[in-house]
């Protein structure tokens, strides 16, 4: 989070910096939606300064920031917690932006800049400060931008309803923000045009949003906005910002693994080229751009050199993960192996390069292991080297936590690497399934339900006819499925129904009717589903009996035709014989 960057400055300089910045803001109290003690007015009062500063320390709570920087010292953390609590009270009691107001603002994104600016001022007055303002300050707009980001999913639904472009609304908002950033520097006639920590954080928040939308061109423009004003933000040990470096690696060095095109051997047909798929193609949480390519190879090596020397960069899980993906995308697997050995002392050989393992960077996480696995598969088109290194990590770092994304990627890659002509039963994928069960059993945990993992295993079950695998999957995920169904997850429910119908169909076709009844009793999950499965089972049994009946009748008909043909041949033989 951006306030962490200020730890390296003396406390008095930080206080002086923010005192100077916040003195330009009106200290007039703003009405909040709360209750003052011993008051009947039903409005509590906090100065604007309190919750502007408070916004800076609730990034991980309110904004759900998915990447972190170096650790804040204990003294600064205790001070920041007080500011955060004041802001949290404001947000807890505050009324979210209503739908009517959001529609008005989104509709105004098609207007010119002045009209859009007036609409944003109206939104601020409607939701934060009822005091009318002709022009919003940069701090007000920053606060509003973060508030809108927390409601981005609601904004997306509204955009669909009113047929407005969701990405255009956000880019219009950023354009207004960038204009105010430059106008502020022109007003005070600053020679140093560098963005401050708050502005860098806001810009990176917008980059993250556009990456999620698949709008990489807009994300590139915002990244250039940062780099033009802070040219040393990537390679300076003193001023390096982890969030900006991560986004640079993602946008310009290939560290967006969901965009990578992976060869799918399981769909290869004889005489045809292998089908190329993207890892994120089936993921609905992000949208993928139609094109993606890395552009800057030289800066990557400089960033890697800096990251391997700076402790604060080595402690960033997100930075190391994107660095690994960048090397993988550019085919630099030898450099990648040396980096892994330098940071975690794990080599591609069976044993680690040191007797005593002592990592120099952050403890290996699921995110880092996914990046290693995907990077090696992208270059080798085989899981052998990646799984060998993965096995060493699990052996020598027993506390590593493997989340749902890790297992999803493992099943995706093992499925893509599977060649049906050489392995009809998909034993490599089944082996990964048993590995997952053993890991969760060793940790005494239950596997979390993941749609893509279920879909990959369903495809394997259907292609190989391995219905015991499907039953085993439902048995292992049963507690999670029951919990997910209670939350009304439509996609998971649909894939579960596919499992059930496929297994019932296989059991009925094999005549195992008692096993079908037992399966429905164990995995019906609720009364309605059990009823539907019984109806489906009855239909399949009826179709099977009809098919068997037709098969018997056809067999009798063929036998009769054969006998009649034999009798005719015999009669012909007798006639020909008498003629001779």
Curated annotation (Swiss-Prot):
Signal peptide: none annotated. It is found in: Mitochondrion. GO terms for biological process: regulation of translation. Residues 1-40 form a transit peptide. Its main location: mitochondrion. One of its GO terms (molecular function) is RNA binding. Transmembrane segments: none annotated. Keywords: Mitochondrion, RNA-binding, Transit peptide, Translation regulation. GO terms for cellular component: mitochondrion. Belongs to the AEP2 family. Required for translation of the mitochondrial OLI1 transcript coding for the mitochondrial ATP synthase subunit 9. Binds to the 5'UTR of the OLI1 mRNA. This is ATPase expression protein 2, mitochondrial. It comes from Saccharomyces cerevisiae (strain RM11-1a) (Baker's yeast). The gene is AEP2.
């Amino acid at each position: 989070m951006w306030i962490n960057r200020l730890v390296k400055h003396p406390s008095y300089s930080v206080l002086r910096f923010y005192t100077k910045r916040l003195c330009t803001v009106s200290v007039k109290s703003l009405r909040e939606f709360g209750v003052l003690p011993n008051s009947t007015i039903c409005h509590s009062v906090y100065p604007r300064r309190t919750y502007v500063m408070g916004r800076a320390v609730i990034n991980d709570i309110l904004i759900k920031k998915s990447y972190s920087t170096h650790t804040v010292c204990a003294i600064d953390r205790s001070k920041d917690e007080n500011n955060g609590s004041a802001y949290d009270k404001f947000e807890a009691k505050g009324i979210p932006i209503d739908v009517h107001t959001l529609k008005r603002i989104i509709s105004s994104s098609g207007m010119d800049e002045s009209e859009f600016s007036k609409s944003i001022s109206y939104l601020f007055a409607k939701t934060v400060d009822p005091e009318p303002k002709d022009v919003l300050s940069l701090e007000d707009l920053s606060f509003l931008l973060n508030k809108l980001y927390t409601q981005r999913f609601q904004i997306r639904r509204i955009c669909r309803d009113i047929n407005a472009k969701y990405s255009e609304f956000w880019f219009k908002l950023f354009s207004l923000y960038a204009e105010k950033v430059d106008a502020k520097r022109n007003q005070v006639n600053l020679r140093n045009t560098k963005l401050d920590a708050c502005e860098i954080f806001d810009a990176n928040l917008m980059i993250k949003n556009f990456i999620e939308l698949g709008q990489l061109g807009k994300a590139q423009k915002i990244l250039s906005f940062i780099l033009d004003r802070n040219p040393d933000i990537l390679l300076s040990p003193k001023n390096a910002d982890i969030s900006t470096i991560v986004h640079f690696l993602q946008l310009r060095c290939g560290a967006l693994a969901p965009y990578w095109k992976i060869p799918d051997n399981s769909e290869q047909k004889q005489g045809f080229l292998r089908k190329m798929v993207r890892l994120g193609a089936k993921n609905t949480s992000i949208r993928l751009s139609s094109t993606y390519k890395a552009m800057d190879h030289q800066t990557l090596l400089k960033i890697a050199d800096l990251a391997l020397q700076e402790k604060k960069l080595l402690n960033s899980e997100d930075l190391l993960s994107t660095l690994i993906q960048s090397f993988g995308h550019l085919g630099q697997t030898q450099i990648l192996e040396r980096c892994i050995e330098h940071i975690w002392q794990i080599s591609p050989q069976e044993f680690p390069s040191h007797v005593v393992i002592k990592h120099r960077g952050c403890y290996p996480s699921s995110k880092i292991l996914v990046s290693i696995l995907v990077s090696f598969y992208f270059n080798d088109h085989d899981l052998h080297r990646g799984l060998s290194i993965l096995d060493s990590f699990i052996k020598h770092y027993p506390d590593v936590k493997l989340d749902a994304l890790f297992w999803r990627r493992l099943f995706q890659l093992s499925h893509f690497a599977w060649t049906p002509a050489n392995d009809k039963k998909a034993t490599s994928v089944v082996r990964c399934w048993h590995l997952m069960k053993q890991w969760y059993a060793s940790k005494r945990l239950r596997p979390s339900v993941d749609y893509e993992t279920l879909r990959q295993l369903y495809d394997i079950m259907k292609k190989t006819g391995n219905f015991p695998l499907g039953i085993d999957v439902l048995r292992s995920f049963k507690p999670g499925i029951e919990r997910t169904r209670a939350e009304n997850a439509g996609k998971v429910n649909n894939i579960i129904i596919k499992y059930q119908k496929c297994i019932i169909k296989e059991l009925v076709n094999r005549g195992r009717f008692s096993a079908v009844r037992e399966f429905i009793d164990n995995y019906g999950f609720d009364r309605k589903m059990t009823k539907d499965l019984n109806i489906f089972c009855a239909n399949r049994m009826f179709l099977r009996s009809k098919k068997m009946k037709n098969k018997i009748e056809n067999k009798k008909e063929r036998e009769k035709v054969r006998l009649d043909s034999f009798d005719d041949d015999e009669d012909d033989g007798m006639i020909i014989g008498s003629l001779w």
